[in-house]
Amino acid sequence: MATAIGLAIYFAERNRGAYHNLFMTFSQKPEFVSLRGETLLQKIKYVERTEWGMNTNFQAAFERVLETALDHDVLPEEMPKALIVVSDMEIDRCGDRNWMFYDHMKEKYEYCGYQLPNIIFWNVDSRNDIFHADSRRKGVQLYSGQSVTTFQNLLNNIDSTPVKSMEKVIESERYACVRTGNAA
């Protein structure tokens, strides 16, 4: 939970425009919450006291993002690039197995002149192998762990597919010795 709280604060402070200082609750009826507090400790205490429904409704989450955009006349370039779900991944099923809700939301966003944000599942617990999408699902990414490298990879690949994100990591300088067989 500490990781999720820290990341909620981190991303809320960096959101732009109508989404600045906002984070979304995990809930059947997700809501944006405005980050409050002057110091980091005050912000942590505030987030800890936030109501969490402890279940998920991703379609409703995407609808909240779109409603906020429409209510505040958000320009397309100011829309969030992704919904980042920081969790132990023991969360409700994402709509149906075929992700029909995601396809429906994509159409709804496009009708309103926006691109649907990616959804990034970030398993910060790493104790299970639950996957909420397969590697071919465009607009969905899967991350696991709490390392700085994981965080950097997420930020560098925020609008990518799972396979493209993986390829970018594998093709990075860090793994050159593995690719060439020149391990020290």
Identify the residue ranges that each predicted region occupies.
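Acidic, glycine-rich A-domain
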Residues: 1-184
